[in-house]
């Protein structure tokens, strides 16, 4: 607890909240080009091969983005749309690739939660 004299000398500084997705620079999404597409393993206690991509954004940042859904067509030089949103069991992955836009196609045979995976309504 500061003394009154200390508060007179220098005021309390307001706490500034930091953004969780700095590479987007306040934009809802950003376009980028995949530089590397690979799989990585989650931290304990989970076990899987999660599909991720290194993406160079138009803002100049090089980020790691998660590719959601079952199966994907992303490869090197694919142009993708990136949104914020971390993957809890992959350290350092703070972005998601948006399926169904640009070069990332929607998930095949998806019936439920289609809007999150870029799938049109089946006939």
Swiss-Prot record:
Keywords: Chloroplast, Plastid, Ribonucleoprotein, Ribosomal protein, RNA-binding, rRNA-binding. One of its GO terms (cellular component) is chloroplast. GO terms for molecular function: rRNA binding; structural constituent of ribosome. Disulfide bonds: none annotated. CDD domains: Ribosomal_S12. One of its GO terms (biological process) is translation. It comes from the Eukaryota. Its main location: plastid. It is found in: Plastid, Chloroplast. HAMAP family: Ribosomal_uS12_B. Belongs to the universal ribosomal protein uS12 family. With S4 and S5 plays an important role in translational accuracy. Located at the interface of the 30S and 50S subunits. Part of the 30S ribosomal subunit. This is Small ribosomal subunit protein uS12c. The gene is rps12.
């Amino acid at each position: 607890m500061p003394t009154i004299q200390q508060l007179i000398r220098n005021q309390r500084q307001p706490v500034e909240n930091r953004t969780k997705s700095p590479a987007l620079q306040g934009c809802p999404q950003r376009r980028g080009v995949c530089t590397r597409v690979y799989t990585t393993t989650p931290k304990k206690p989970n076990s899987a091969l999660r599909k991720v991509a290194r993406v160079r954004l138009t803002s100049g940042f090089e980020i790691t983005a998660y590719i959601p859904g079952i199966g994907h067509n992303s490869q090197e030089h694919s142009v993708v749309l990136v949104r914020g949103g971390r993957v809890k069991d992959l350290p350092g992955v703070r972005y998601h690739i948006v399926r169904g836009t640009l070069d990332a196609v929607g998930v095949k045979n998806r019936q439920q939660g289609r809007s999150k995976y870029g799938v049109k309504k089946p006939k």
